[in-house]
C-alpha cells in the first residue's frame, strides 16, 4: 500500500514513515512471510499524467479516457475513480500502445517519462502528482543476521547516506525534467488537483481497508 495514491503528503512524509512503529510492524510481517527486511524507503518522484491529444485540466476531463495503468488493483481503482477506462498494459508494451492509440495516455514519474522517450508519443504533461513513488532497499534477513556488528553498522550507514543522496538527486532531476520535457515538445498543464484527489480519497481507503488492515491508512496518513 505504500505506493497508494494520495497516501503521502510529500517525500519527507514518506521517509518519516520508515522510522514509525507501524512501518516496523509491516517490516516484521515481511520478515515472517518472505524472509526479507526493508532497510530504507527512497524517493523516486511524483507520478504525473501524460496524454496524447486531449488537454486534461480536471478529473472531469477523464471521462471515458483510456488510461494505461500497471496491472495493479490500486492503480486500476484510481483510474476508475477519475472516471477513466483503466487499461492494464505491461511497461515494455507502453510506447507502442501510445504510438498506435491503443490508449489515450499514461502516468509515471518524470524520470521514467523521460527515459522511455514518451514525449515522442505524448503531447501533454499534466502535473497531477497523484503518487509519491517509493523505492525500497530490501535485504535477505538471514544474510543480515550473518553480518558482524561492525559490518552491519557499515551497511546501515551506507544505506542511510545513499538514501539521502537519492532523495536529493531525484528532487533535483524533477525540477530539471519539466523543462527538458517542455523543450522536447510537451505542453505542461497545471490541473485542478483537488478534482483528482477527492474522488480517490473517497473511494480507495474504504475499498482496500480489508486488504491493508483496518486503520493502517489513517495511521500512515497521520504521521
Where are these regions (language model features)?
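N-terminal secretory/targeting leader peptides
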Residues: 1-13, 22, 28-223
Amino acid at each position: 500500500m505504500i505506493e497508494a495514491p494520495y497516501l503521502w503528503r510529500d517525500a519527507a512524509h514518506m521517509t518519516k514513515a520508515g522510522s514509525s512503529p507501524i512501518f516496523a510492524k509491516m517490516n516484521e510481517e515481511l520478515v515472517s512471510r518472505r524472509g526479507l527486511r526493508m532497510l530504507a524507503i527512497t524517493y523516486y518522484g511524483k507520478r504525473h499524467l501524460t496524454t496524447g491529444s486531449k488537454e486534461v485540466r480536471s478529473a472531469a476531463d477523464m471521462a471515458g479516457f483510456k488510461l494505461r495503468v500497471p496491472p495493479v488493483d490500486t492503480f486500476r481503482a484510481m483510474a476508475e475513480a477519475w472516471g477513466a477506462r483503466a487499461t492494464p498494459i505491461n511497461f515494455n508494451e507502453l510506447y507502442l500502445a501510445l504510438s498506435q492509440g491503443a490508449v489515450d495516455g499514461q502516468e509515471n514519474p518524470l524520470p521514467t517519462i523521460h527515459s522511455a522517450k514518451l514525449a515522442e508519443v505524448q503531447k501533454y504533461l499534466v502535473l497531477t502528482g497523484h503518487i509519491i513513488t517509493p523505492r525500497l532497499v530490501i535485504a535477505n534477513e538471514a544474510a543480515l543476521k550473518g553480518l558482524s556488528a561492525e559490518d552491519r553498522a557499515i551497511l546501515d550507514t551506507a544505506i542511510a547516506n545513499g538514501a539521502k543522496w537519492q532523495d536529493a538527486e531525484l528532487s533535483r532531476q524533477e525540477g530539471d525534467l519539466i523543462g527538458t520535457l517542455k523543450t522536447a515538445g510537451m505542453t505542461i498543464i497545471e490541473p485542478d488537483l483537488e478534482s483528482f484527489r477527492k474522488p480517490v480519497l473517497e473511494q480507495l481507503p474504504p475499498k482496500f481497508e480489508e486488504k491493508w488492515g483496518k486503520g493502517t491508512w489513517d495511521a500512515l496518513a497521520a504521521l
